[in-house]
């Protein structure tokens, strides 16, 4: 594959020029709610650009997985209908963090364009910002001035946000020739098809203040991005990105599955392009730990899947098919992205489950569509509200709705539809926009040099100094008795909550006062904050203090954390290698582990998992911790890493018996320290995600003791030895079942006897028999039995109405024989008209309906009303 060669050569080029190759971050940022998806190579370096994080390197190069399908950058609706829009793409990039600037960035880009991309220099053009004389002069070394263009802020100024780092940018374009347009220069190429942009170089040299002032940055940075798919298309000289390399390989697989040949110019061509693109977004997102859902990123992922399914229908796919395309994707991208290969089973299971669910939804949507078409008949126009509901709820694209409307010669109220679209996007924007509370803000406002050294792996107590105090969400210099606040220490043994493990609690004290630490957090890189309350005395900044972690709680938390690792490995060994951690929480009392699995665990599964963990505890293996290069870990299949997480150059490997994981948390010294492991609960938390809750040590033993006490009480109540409890309970259940059958038989006999009497009470009109009967509250418990029995006796031309009372309301059941429903007589219509005057409500079908009402007239009036209704219906 050309893309594999280009990617590899690009990264090698920059690695040979002292750039550190950095692995792609996940397609969705775990710690940045300001964006839905990773949409550029610079996303993972955002805090470095902002000066909030330090790194061991000043130059980096990446091939970043990106998704543009939500928020500010949303290409979803264009995919399949243009030559180059994609929801998933790879962005090649090189970065400088206060190292080189424009001269080297431009020099590197020119060399790569010629030696790696093999572009003819006579067809390369550049744009610069109209005020960027430096960049213009640098490009003059490589290009004639008539192929360098000055553009405005709109095209050549980049900013991360309204305030903060920003700067001029320079774009590289390639002239694809007159075949793609008659424009003589990029300025005339309105749609950008002939002069195709292939690389953007961003020069971050300013810091924009809230009033718009541009101040010079102390550290100037470079951020570049080149779309790999676009480069491949240029080199392969294809008209669109879909005719080359990976995407064409996927289209070939779709051709094979559908039995339909792809033609770029035919209407069905869009379906091939949509599926080929969307399967990449879906697969990489699931591999990185995201699942389809009803909110935020999960909702966008579900929209992508449903869009792919809808386009698949145009190719004849009327059953789940996306999972069948996944192996072809892994064949061509699995080597570059091992997380894809490791997650094949999980990806396929999630896709199939979602597709099955959506096909059922589409059946309901099809019914709704027919209702919409029927209700629109008089105006020959589908309302904007209905069109939006079909698109938003059932995933029917607006162009598909438009085609259906065209078949009926209907118009669509597009003004209302587009208004609702805008409102929905605004709601989505507000939901995903990062909200900063006051406490977040005050932490960000702290001096960047105000950091803490964590020494808590080796000790639980140390003498240190107070570096900072926060009180009432403001930076302060002291805390007085009773004050709640936060303390920052120069060095600290307190573990800050992260990676699923709760932060430490304990005390910070000196002769002047004692601060009770309730929780410890790390609001930003390098900063450890101790939250709590001053129980006595006073404390001020710069004071010498002692920091003491609660030893008992730390030990129990550490044991639980190691137990969580053993549980994770036991799940994988018991259920299969598709198991992946989807979240965890560990404190001193419990373990909570979320994992990918599509069905509930059987009692046998849970017993096997619990037994395996306890076996490893009894083996009392030492828990070893070592720091290694992340590059070494990437080549090891033994060490469990979480592909959705971001790691530094040096990582911490925790080994406990058969478990080996990357982890920054605290752990037991040996597996035997855990003592005993007990699963307390297993349940679903989302589609494809299960959760196990467990505990260890004394807490687990207490649960076992409590259950033993319960067993003793049960044995006493049912008068059985403990070892015979199950036999006795089964015997009692069988007796109960037999008694229930006897009761049911007696009730049926009672109903049958009463029905024989009721047959003589039936009246007749229009050759149709009918009955109105009031049941006592006790009889009303068998209201369906009565209706079934009498309609069995009178199977045709018969309508019955049954009334009883329950909880102060009237319960009404209407039944209509099947032959009458074919003549237009509907049970739910009868009941709705009958209850409407009294504020009642009902539901049901043509043959049977049930409702309730606080009021009803006398039975004689109901009898008369039913008689009149039948006469009207069958006249």
From Swiss-Prot:
Ranges in a coiled coil: none
Top-level taxon of origin: Bacteria
Keywords tagged on the record: Aminoacyl-tRNA synthetase, ATP-binding, Cytoplasm, Ligase, Metal-binding, Nucleotide-binding, Protein biosynthesis, RNA-binding, tRNA-binding, Zinc
An annotated GO cellular component: cytosol
Necessary cofactors: Zn(2+)
PROSITE patterns (UniProt xref): AA_TRNA_LIGASE_II_ALA
Cofactor: binding details: Binds 1 zinc ion per subunit.
Keyword ATP-binding applies: yes
GO annotation (BP), single: alanyl-tRNA aminoacylation
Function, in words: Catalyzes the attachment of alanine to tRNA(Ala) in a two-step reaction: alanine is first activated by ATP to form Ala-AMP and then transferred to the acceptor end of tRNA(Ala). Also edits incorrectly charged Ser-tRNA(Ala) and Gly-tRNA(Ala) via its editing domain.
Similarity comment text for this entry: Belongs to the class-II aminoacyl-tRNA synthetase family.
Protein name: Alanine--tRNA ligase
